[in-house]
Amino acid sequence: MAEKKGSSSEKTLYCSFCGKSQHEVKKLIAGPSVFICDECIDLCNEIIRDELPAGEEAREARSDLPTPLEIKTNLDNYVIGQEPAKRMLSVAVYNHYKRLRHKEKAKGDDVELSKSNILLIGPTGSGKTLLAQTLARMLDVPFVMADATTLTEAGYVGEDVENIIQKLLQSCNYEVERAQRGIVYIDEIDKISRKSDNPSITRDVSGEGVQQALLKLIEGTMASVPPQGGRKHPNQDFLQIDTTNILFICGGAFAGLEKVIENRTEASGIGFGASVKSKAQRSITEVFREVEPEDLIKFGLIPELVGRMPVVASLAELSEDALVQILTEPKNAVVKQFTKLLQMEGVDLEIRPAALKAIARKALARKTGARGLRSILEQSLIDTMFELPNATNVDKVVVEESTIDENKPPLLVYREAAKKA
């Protein structure tokens, strides 16, 4: 029963399985002399899913999802140190995307898995942004980075929080389905803390007000976003984006949070059995590892927002040795990048070990962390890179400790001298 003649000359098509006409269903798909409707396709999928063994379904759901170990191994290629944070992130991201697969395949399941958004706490230049970027690149999902300090409540001068979702859509060429599985990294989240831990009667459009607006996005809402190119006329529909499955990673330096944590731990550590350790003996990293939700609330984040970010990972302040490793070891290491740039001119680059340590020391002194490494090396090589394209017979550029500490020009080795050596 594929087609029947109606009262008119046109033929009415029917589903070969359930017998419904093309007017009773949304879609009728044609095969060789047979037709199947969208309702029968859904029914067939349901039967196959029900008959699939639980273990096989789980394996299928995980087939192309990297394991926590694989995620961490990939992070190791780009991020030096921060082992506890990388392990915690790997598990959280794996569970998040495993939850999405489960949600798609097990509709009607009585167990509802909640989303675990992530909060990264650590000093400037410790790798918070790089961790989020590397995760998104590895998982091949849309990624956008937003600065919390530019956000204001809707209706005020500044950037609306829903602009974040619009940027996410732009990053994947307005593919709504892909955007709804993306990653959003919100930097400087600590800068929108409310001015006191007591609710204020005055408007705080860039503090608590923004937190309330972000809360809706993070916990899951339907965000209205203008279509690509903006609305051409007032009646054109907005795109509706469900943020329920978007993974939000928030990061901040949280300067001053260590005092809040110390006040709490000192208050609870009174008595004969209490362990005594002076403030001078504890690094900020050690203190941050003891952070509790109540500390973040005391710092100025609203309780609802803290509750939506159950995974809290603290990043360590980078040591001199770690900064030297960052200069040379990752796939996108600064030294490797400058070596490649000079090789394009037919010149080798050598940076002496003492010079690497000098760069690390200067970055520590500036309190810029890994972020400051590139600018220090660039500053020492800028004149050389300006002159190299016009220079002849230069074989190698050597950066010594004095190049960094005393601003002396790098040593240039010429081809004739190189041959004699």
Swiss-Prot record:
CDD domains: RecA-like_ClpX. One of its GO terms (cellular component) is HslUV protease complex. ATP binds at P123, T124, G125, S126, G127, K128, T129, L130. Pfam families: AAA_2, ClpB_D2-small, zf-C4_ClpX. Component of the ClpX-ClpP complex. Forms a hexameric ring that, in the presence of ATP, binds to fourteen ClpP subunits assembled into a disk-like structure with a central cavity, resembling the structure of eukaryotic proteasomes. One of its GO terms (biological process) is proteolysis involved in protein catabolic process. Zn(2+) binds at C15, C18, C37, C40. Residues 3-56 form the ClpX-type ZB domain. PROSITE patterns: CLPX_ZB. Keywords: ATP-binding, Chaperone, Metal-binding, Nucleotide-binding, Zinc. SUPFAM superfamilies: Glucocorticoid receptor-like (DNA-binding domain), P-loop containing nucleoside triphosphate hydrolases. ATP-dependent specificity component of the Clp protease. It directs the protease to specific substrates. Can perform chaperone functions in the absence of ClpP. Belongs to the ClpX chaperone family. It comes from the Bacteria. PANTHER family: ATP-DEPENDENT CLP PROTEASE ATP-BINDING SUBUNIT CLPX-LIKE, MITOCHONDRIAL, ATP-DEPENDENT CLP PROTEASE ATP-BINDING SUBUNIT CLPX-LIKE, MITOCHONDRIAL-RELATED. Disulfide bonds: none annotated. InterPro entries: AAA+_ATPase, ATP-dep_Clp_protease_ClpX, ATPase_AAA_core, Clp_ATPase_C, Clp_protease_ATP-bd_su_ClpX, ClpX_bact, P-loop_NTPase, Znf_CppX_C4. This is ATP-dependent Clp protease ATP-binding subunit ClpX. GO terms for molecular function: ATP binding; ATP hydrolysis activity; ATP-dependent protein folding chaperone; protein dimerization activity; unfolded protein binding; zinc ion binding.
